[in-house]
Amino acid sequence: MRKELNFDLFYHFLDVWLPQADRLAKGFEEAKPFPHIVLDDFLPRAGADFILEHFPSPTCRSFGQPDNKFQVRKLGQIQKNYFRGVPQTLRYLLHDFNSMAFVEFIERLTGIRGIIPDPHFHGGAFHQSLPGGHLGIHADFNVDRRRRLLRRVNVLIYFNKHWKSGYGGDLELWDTSLIQCEQRIEPIFNRCVIFETSSNSYHGHPVPIAENAPENRKSLALYYYAADQRAFDPGFAHSTIWKDE
């Protein structure tokens, strides 16, 4: 039986954020180095607390993603094992981010019509970086090859309740020429970052997490797509593009 919760993400998106989408859209569109927005206190406090309380442990058997030179001590790929080890209620909550209320909010905020959520959570869902961990600057893969859809929007929500600026792990947004970082965003609790995804929306958290950080850097990553003829062009699709690759 599904546990009754004292919050409702669907109606929070519908009643709190959807009415603000048109007002926020201009700031999103004009943000540099590429369209993005930072929204604090994004989830109802009870909802954010619940997700943090039940966030999968680093020892969860579904976590994977071995180290390489671009990402170190970063856990992800939990969806590849069908979320085994993740509490049932937490799995149910993921679907609220694929709901009509949230998708319409994303459409109106970004101006991108025909947004399609990802029930497979390919590359997304629960991520965490351990002390010493980092994620190199990169542009994400641009095509869902399984469904032939173009990737358009990333949504990142952070669950780090005691985070301080000295712990590293800031999300960095770089210019399209990969010359410099133009925005640094601290991954503080219940902060949401939404940005338009393209082949030059370079981002990452290259500064390693401090060894004395009292918690792992935890985030929920959600990716959204749209139909586009270019998704059928083998020459257009690419995997992750890493800085200095």
Model-identified regions with their sequence ranges:
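Fe(II)/2-oxoglutarate
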Residues: M1-K32, H238-E245
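Catalytic core of Fe(II)/2-oxoglutarate
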Residues: R2-K3, G132, V143-R151, N160-E245
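Non-heme Fe(II)/2-oxoglutarate
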Residues: L9, V16, A25-L109
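Histidine-centered active-site/metal-ligand motif
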Residues: H36, H138, H203-H205
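Conserved strand-loop elements at the edges of beta-sheets that form or border functional pockets
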Residues: D41, Q128, P187
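Non-heme Fe(II) oxygenase catalytic core, chiefly the N-lobe of the double-stranded beta-helix
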Residues: H54-P56, R84-T89, L94-R151
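Proline-centered turn/helix-capping motifs that create local helix->coil transitions or kinks
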Residues: T59-C60, R113-I116, K161-S165
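Eukaryotic charged/polar low-complexity linker/IDR segments
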Residues: N154-L156
